[in-house]
């Protein structure tokens, strides 16, 4: 049998940093108000870089670290809810940029769960035996869909990208998964961007992301924690077997409550939302890459981690992976 493993990690963020104090100059907020409620202290915001630009930086790093040529990559999946255009896809732009002439490429949109959904999809492609190597990247420029006068959303999000190289392995690394969607609750978080039909009188001009923060918070604590507990139980692992839980970096309070609901020590939940804010589909791979850089992750195949994303759709999904 053929299995899949994560062999490389990388991340990139725009150089421009907007601190909470900077936001207090343009809206009714303060560093204390933001940090006490979210844990966020700053975020990276793109000036001129596109979502594809951020993803390109990650892809370049992954290729360089691996020692492979871009022509050896079989596929590229980019998880994003902020693509630069309807077509070509962000992934196609990355494919062209790095010269991955033999790779097929496509985007996947599942909001803040996007990277988990994309990684699960990529694992199936490699496990089929048809493909050997693939790039899975989460990339977002959420700043371009924010209403910068709305402190309910503007203070939360940031731009960035992270990703992994996934390749074939003789050993099993992906141990369990759970992917979920509840489209009946899509109104909790949405960006009502649309195209105006010339045959309709309806005008779609609401271009900003909207979010019911309390509803998302309650959903994450109740549904996502339940899903994670169930996944661990059905994986035949004990909670003590999980070395770290890499959750979507939306809010420090969510991680605090998740730790209690799942009954796993808080220090097993790495975090970096204080430096990046909520980067949607990019948050988990950025955190993974930083955790490897600081020595928390070894990439030796001996650590067991749980990845969990949750957000608009509603979508939520978790993977248990040997890394």
UniProtKB/Swiss-Prot annotation:
State a GO cellular component annotated for this protein. cytoplasm
Q: How does it assemble?
A: Homodimer.
Where does it live in the cell?
Cytoplasm
* Keyword Disulfide bond applies: no
State the active site. 112, 248, 278
EC main class here is transferase
- The protein's predominant localisation is cytoplasm
Q: What is known of its domains?
A: The last Arg residue of the ACP-binding site is essential for the weak association between ACP/AcpP and FabH.
Q: Where is this region: ACP-binding?
A: 249-253
Domain of life of the source:
Bacteria
Similarity remark: Belongs to the thiolase-like superfamily. FabH family.
**What does this chain do?**
Catalyzes the condensation reaction of fatty acid synthesis by the addition to an acyl acceptor of two carbons from malonyl-ACP. Catalyzes the first condensation reaction which initiates fatty acid synthesis and may therefore play a role in governing the total rate of fatty acid production. Possesses both acetoacetyl-ACP synthase and acetyl transacylase activities. Its substrate specificity determines the biosynthesis of branched-chain and/or straight-chain of fatty acids.
The record lists the catalysed reaction(s) as: malonyl-[ACP] + acetyl-CoA + H(+) = 3-oxobutanoyl-[ACP] + CO2 + CoA
EC number in record: 2.3.1.180
Name used for this protein in its record:
Beta-ketoacyl-[acyl-carrier-protein] synthase III
Q: Which UniProt keywords apply?
A: Acyltransferase, Cytoplasm, Fatty acid biosynthesis, Fatty acid metabolism, Lipid biosynthesis, Lipid metabolism, Multifunctional enzyme, Transferase
Record's keyword annotation contains Protein biosynthesis: no
What GO biological process, any one, is recorded here?
fatty acid biosynthetic process
